[in-house]
């Protein structure tokens, strides 16, 4: 039996199953596919967004009938939930190899790596001759606010199974602390009771730097521990007698842009997620352009959801769903909306990969406006 409810087609079936002389009724099965009603006249995304007011909105790429009949439908041709509009600068880079750096060769015409200013990774400048700190004792001598640990470093964390116990002296685990951002808290000198990789309990007097990881875990890093540590933020109270001019720093992309990042600068990604799409990623990137980008984060309205970042441009054209009040309670739509609430911001700030993109005029416009702001 089929009936129409609020513009959505629902299928209700009853199957009688006999098992062990008992009859069971199956639950009604609801159609997962939404029946949309589309506008007849296709429009650019900007016109649709301006006329819709606040997002979200539902659209579909417009195809001429001949193209729609002959071409297989891609994700972008499916109904899309427009979720979030983005206006901001992105840094366009090309992959560079160590051979390119040594020979001075030009970057190949490879895919472009796009870095949004909200990307949470950490970089260093390749031309920077400053060196990272190599021991925790050297870090403790400066006592910065934040550092980036580039490699694994041996340390101690509280054993979660004994944290709430009545032990007079807490038990720690001796582990390798993963690379990442560390907030420097204080110096502690005391006996540390711990278990090593052989599960043997030991007790040792240690002088440690107490730090907090990105997931709010307190770690004890012994002064003799070796690694590679880049400064991120130093304290105003750092002694003038301590020379920190020749120590390597790590920067996020937003701070570098604010400080005047320009074309031709070469960066190395020290810590952060690489692009999810293949692009021959080398972690060494040469800045090609600084682009003012107008995009919208979207998602396919389907069981297999795919996130997209669409340029708000004159082409391609889209048609808009007209029957919004009728499908806003459909489970597939609600699932997609929930998925975007959870994932849209993270996706917007990921490294993206683009192909065959030339925007010299736009880049010059960004540079000119930046210089104008500096004069003001």
PLM regions: where:
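Src homology 3 (SH3)-mediated interaction modules
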Residues: 2-376
